């Protein structure tokens, strides 16, 4: 990602809950100041040390809640403080449905299923995997971490 210094400075301070690159991209998109260039602007090599692992730090359902569901909810709510558009409203509804489903609130399963278009794979995973017994859930998480699922 490349950004004009003045624009980046105008978005300060960065919130602690959000990765800085994500926050900058979100704010620029909300301002209508983002574009995609097909041709590379810099030489860049992706390697294992600079990629975030899938389900890093998740070994049980409580970890999943804290690191996947709650982090997303915090991020969406933080974004909602600086912008408003339909996709963000969908993300907020999906996030609330994820929390309701995790806590097995009445209507949580149905609400999450209705919002599946926001992220189909995660929705299906949460609808079913979170209802598995803990040993099977842990096994499923290990398969996801290894790239099998």
Stretches found by the model and what they are:
Residues 1-10:
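Conserved nucleotide-sugar donor-binding
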Residues 2, 28-29:
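Short leucine-rich amphipathic alpha-helices used at interfaces
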Residues 2, 35-38:
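A structural signal for short, well-ordered beta-strand segments and their strand-loop junctions
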Residues 5-6, 39, 46-48:
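Residues immediately flanking
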Residues 10, 14, 30-31:
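Structured helix-beta-strand junction loops
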Residues 17-18, 22-23, 30, 43-149:
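C-terminal subregions of glycosyltransferases and related glycan-biosynthesis enzymes
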Residues 26-28, 36:
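A generic structural signal for short, solvent-exposed coil/turn residues
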